[in-house]
Every structure is written in structure tokens, then in C-alpha cells.
Swiss-Prot record:
The gene is cbh1. Belongs to the glycosyl hydrolase 7 (cellulase C) family. Keywords: Carbohydrate metabolism, Cellulose degradation, Disulfide bond, Glycoprotein, Glycosidase, Hydrolase, Polysaccharide degradation, Pyrrolidone carboxylic acid, Secreted, Signal. Residues 409-423 have a biased composition (Polar residues). One of its GO terms (biological process) is cellulose catabolic process. It is found in: Secreted. It comes from Trichoderma harzianum (Hypocrea lixii). Residues 18-449 are annotated as: Catalytic. It catalyses: Hydrolysis of (1->4)-beta-D-glucosidic linkages in cellulose and cellotetraose, releasing cellobiose from the non-reducing ends of the chains. GO terms for cellular component: extracellular region. Exocellobiohydrolases (CBH) that catalyzes the hydrolysis of 1,4-beta-D-glucosidic bonds in cellulose to release the disaccharide cellobiose. The degradation of cellulose involves an interplay between different cellulolytic enzymes. Hydrolysis starts with endoglucanases (EGs), which cut internal beta-1,4-glucosidic bonds in cellulose to reduce the polymerization degree of the substrate and create new chain ends for exocellobiohydrolases (CBHs). The CBHs release the disaccharide cellobiose from the non-reducing end of the cellulose polymer chain. This is Exoglucanase 1. One of its GO terms (molecular function) is cellulose binding.
Length: 505
């Protein structure tokens, strides 16, 4: 993205690269979150910062753009080093240009604001440092409203192992640092970043053929990634992505792997990860818009994710005061509702693809959980595959019987960015009520441990039941390997959703 401003004045830092200018003052929107212990939660006064890739990048001595549309200035940016010396990042008009607003503990991201599309923000500990979270042995909870996110959009909340200062101390060329949203990395080793490691990414830059604002450069930025929440109103996924090197590293060309390279699996990170999407696992009535779903995405919900010290990952939800466990899944020899080594192996066997252990699996991503990770909150559309991997049938040539291909109910013709941007510009996501602490401390949206009196509507992990036992509404009542109740409570019937899962509806 770029902006044109009339005033001509700039803060010059000629001795360093990836500089800072002040045509627009940089004021981080405040955002309150809570740190929890067994005795309760304490408010923390944080803020959010916009990623550097969205910012106006211009000549340090004028308002001439260094990056315009999806191309670099050949005069200011003949190579990576010269470009970084000549160009600066400017402050952001968060609400007016990017559609980013905060109120108390809530962050709202608008999809389209004037010419801007989407956004990516980080939670700050102070004005120049990202807030870091050690996930191992802890849980992370937040409220989310995805009611305004149709097919093709992704309101993503996740953690990455990027440097807390945005790489400012590690790379002398980076004068902007975390204050201006630098240092991003993830498991796709993105090559669309304008600056990496304090230098520009202009060498080898190829403007996108289908996106007027982006391109692919000669370098990428890799690090471990934990996708807590990738979702719209139709589908949601929880996915760990390990990298051979936990922290941020720069890669070159197609050896980066990931979305931006011809060799997707040629890098040091796992671009696919080990995902848990209830719809993909056969539970097509757990999550979606309307009262026919266990979790109704027309309403706000609370998402609680727990990280055991062995690297396994558990999840439950709270909506309208009712607790919903992650639904059980039967995948090959695996039966349960936790991402662990057995599940990841069974998923790969059942659905195909590369082995989750190729880049170290849960043992490797657990190293990231044991260190500091930065919280990312974003909203985006997908110019690569139209978000079909999240909410539709993918690959699109798969048949109805292809294991793991059906990920959501969206049409395979949906999600085309040009159409989504034109038809749903007012889409938005709201993240709020962020809480973090030891397992059992965040209490969902109640401020206490999950209430024992709440109804758990997802399948229980029962090992048996008496012949007279009945299952509640939305509970599992049959399927391959199921040994729990097969009778439903009065008013409901046991309906077969697939060979592995029947549900009381």
C-alpha cells in the first residue's frame, strides 16, 4: 500500500537503512488484555502496531514513493542495500487509512477501507517491543466475532517466533524496529515482504499478475508459526507449523518453500502443518452460521486453546455461557480431540501429503512454545487459492469421497479476491477479551475456571455407558469405534454424518 501526502518534511537517519519518516505521526492504538493466574486475571495496558508491509514507503528526502502499486522505484531502489538507505517507513493513520480501531479490550479490523485491503497487527508490550508469550504449560483465550466474514476471507489470530524488537538490534540496517511493525516471519517464509533483515527485497522482485499491490521478491522470512485461529463464518482451523530453525531466518528464492515458491516443500518450514478443522474431520454441523450449528457464528464466541508441556494442543469454546469441547474425531487408528503425535500421524496417513515429522513435528514446534512468541491479528483474502483450503473443497478436482478434501461448505468458485473485495468490502472481524495464563486460569469469558455446571455439547471421551445412557443435543451417538451412548435425549435423533461420526440432532 502507499499513500500520497502534501507536506514535504522527513526525519532523516542517513547513517542507517530501513529508516523512519514522520509525515504521519505513529500512535499505537491502545488495547487492554489480561494476564491470569489461579487467583484471577489482571488487566494489562497494551497496544497494537501495523505491520511494515502495509505502510507508506517513500524517499527520506521527499514524498516520492519508493514503492508504488506493486513495483519499486528504479531510481531510489536499484538494489536491496541502496533502497534501504534511500527509503523510509512512515506512520499510520490506523482508522482512516487501514480501518483499524480499538475500544477497551476489542480490536476491529475492517476488510476494505478506501484503497486499502486487509491488515496485519501485532500486540505491543511497550512502544518499541512486541509482547511475547510463552505458550508451553499455558492457555490463551479470546473472544471473536466472525459474523461478517463470508467465504474467501480469513480472520487469523496466531503466534510467530519473530524478534521482540522487530529485528532492530540484530540487523543494524533496521532503524524502524517493532515500533513500525518490522521483522515479520512465518512458516510460509513469505517473499512478499518489502524489507527483510534491514534490507529491501527489491532484487528479483516480480510484481503479482493478479494483485495490484503485491509481488514476490528474491528473499523470504521464515520462523515457527502457531495458527490459533484461521476462520470465517463457515470454517475454522487450528494448526501448528514447525520450522527447523525456531526463530526468524532469511531464505533465498524457491529454497524458501511455502506459498510463494515453486517448490512448496523445499524450505526449512512446514507450510501445511498438522491442522484440526472440524468440518474436514467429518463434523459438518459443529461450526457455522445459524442455530442448526453447535457453535453459531452469527454470534460472538470464546476460544480457549491449551498447550501441554509435551507439545500437545487442546481446545474448547464457550458461547452463551455454554462450554463446547473440541469435537472428537476418528481418523484411522486415532480417536480423540487433541492435536498430538498420534493424531498428526493418523491425519497424514488418512489425507495424504507430507509427514508432519519432516520438519520436526510437535517436538520442534514445542521448542517455539517454550520460547517467546509474538501475537498476530489479521484479516486477509487469498490471491493464491481463494481460501479454498479453509472453507471449500480443495484441491478443487477432488471427488466427494476424497479423504480430507472437504474443508467447508463454500463453493469451489468462491473466494476470488476481486469479487470478495467488490461484493463484501464492509466485512470485518472483532477480536476481544484476550487472556493468557496457566492452564485453567483464563476461564473463557467468565473470568474463572470453566464452570462444571456448563453443558458440554461436543462428543465426550467416554469409554463406555450403560444401555440406558442418553446423549445430549449435538453429542456424538455413533460411528466407527464409538463406545459411548447411542440413544439421544428426548426430542433428538441420532443422524449419520459419515461412517466415523453420528450426532444427536
Amino acid at each position: 500500500m502507499y499513500r500520497k501526502l502534501a507536506v514535504i518534511s522527513a526525519f532523516l537517519a542517513a547513517a542507517r537503512a530501513q529508516q523512519v519518516c514522520t509525515q504521519q505521526a505513529e500512535t499505537h492504538p491502545p488495547l487492554t488484555w489480561q494476564k491470569c493466574t489461579a487467583s484471577g486475571c489482571t488487566p494489562q495496558q497494551g497496544s497494537v502496531v501495523l505491520d511494515a508491509n502495509w505502510r507508506w514507503t517513500h524517499d527520506t528526502k521527499s514524498t516520492t514513493n519508493c514503492y508504488d502499486g506493486n513495483t519499486w522505484s528504479s531510481t531510489l531502489c536499484p538494489d536491496d542495500a541502496t533502497c534501504a538507505k534511500n527509503c523510509c517507513l512512515d506512520g499510520a493513520n490506523y482508522s482512516g487509512t487501514y480501518g483499524v480501531t480499538t475500544s477497551g479490550d476489542a480490536l476491529t479490523l475492517q476488510f476494505v477501507t478506501a484503497s486499502n485491503v486487509g491488515s496485519r497487527l501485532y500486540l505491543m508490550a511497550n512502544d518499541s517491543t512486541y509482547q511475547e508469550f510463552t505458550l508451553s504449560g499455558n492457555e490463551f483465550s479470546f473472544d471473536v466475532d466472525v459474523s461478517q466474514l463470508p467465504c474467501g476471507l480469513n480472520g487469523a489470530l496466531y503466534f510467530v517466533s519473530m524478534d521482540a524488537d522487530g529485528g532492530q538490534s540484530k540487523y543494524p540496517g533496521n532503524a524502524a524496529g517493532a515500533k513500525y511493525g518490522t521483522g515479520y516471519c512465518d512458516s510460509q517464509c513469505p517473499r512478499d515482504l518489502k524489507f527483510i533483515n534491514g534490507q529491501a527485497n527489491v532484487e528479483g522482485w516480480e510484481p503479482s499478475s493478479n494483485n495490484a499491490n503485491t509481488g514476490v521478491g528474491g528473499h523470504g522470512s521464515c520462523c515457527s508459526e502457531m495458527d490459533i485461529w484461521e476462520a470465517n463464518s463457515i470454517s475454522e482451523a487450528l494448526t501448528p507449523h514447525p520450522c527447523e530453525t525456531v526463530g526468524q531466518t532469511m531464505c533465498s528464492g524457491d529454497s524458501c518453500g511455502g506459498t510463494y515458491s515453486n517448490d512448496r516443500y523445499g524450505g526449512t518450514c512446514d507450510p501445511d502443518g498438522c491442522d484440526w478443522n472440524p468440518y474436514r474431520l467429518g463434523n459438518t454441523s459443529f461450526y457455522g452460521p445459524g442455530s442448526s450449528f453447535a457453535l453459531d457464528t452469527t454470534k460472538k464466541l470464546t476460544v480457549v486453546t491449551q498447550f501441554a508441556t509435551d507439545g500437545s494442543i487442546s481446545r474448547y469454546y464457550v458461547q452463551n455461557g455454554v462450554k463446547f469441547q473440541q469435537p472428537n474425531a476418528q481418523v484411522g487408528s486415532y480417536s480423540g480431540n487433541t492435536i498430538n503425535t498420534d493424531y498428526c500421524a493418523a491425519e497424514q496417513t488418512a489425507f495424504g501429503g507430507t509427514s508432519f515429522t519432516d520438519k520436526g513435528g510437535l517436538a520442534q514446534i514445542n521448542k517455539a512454545f517454550q520460547g517467546g512468541m509474538v501475537l498476530v491479528m489479521s484479516l486477509w483474502d487469498d490471491y493464491a487459492v481463494n481460501m479454498l483450503w479453509l472453507d471449500s473443497t480443495y484441491p478443487t478436482n477432488a471427488t466427494a469421497s476424497t479423504p480430507g478434501a472437504k474443508r467447508g461448505s463454500c463453493s469451489t468458485s468462491s473466494g476470488v479476491p476481486a469479487q470478495v473485495e467488490a461484493q463484501s468490502p464492509n466485512s470485518k472481524v472483532i477480536y476481544s477479551n484476550i487472556r493468557f495464563g496457566p492452564i485453567g486460569s483464563t476461564g473463557g469469558n467468565t473470568g474463572s475456571n470453566p464452570p462444571g455446571t456448563s453443558t458440554t455439547r461436543a462428543p465426550p471421551s467416554s469409554t463406555g455407558s450403560s444401555p440406558t445412557a442418553t446423549q445430549t443435543h449435538y453429542g456424538q451417538c455413533g460411528g466407527t469405534g464409538w463406545t459411548g451412548p447411542t440413544r439421544c435425549a428426548s426430542g433428538y435423533t441420532c443422524q449419520v454424518l459419515n461412517p466415523f461420526y453420528s450426532q444427536c440432532l
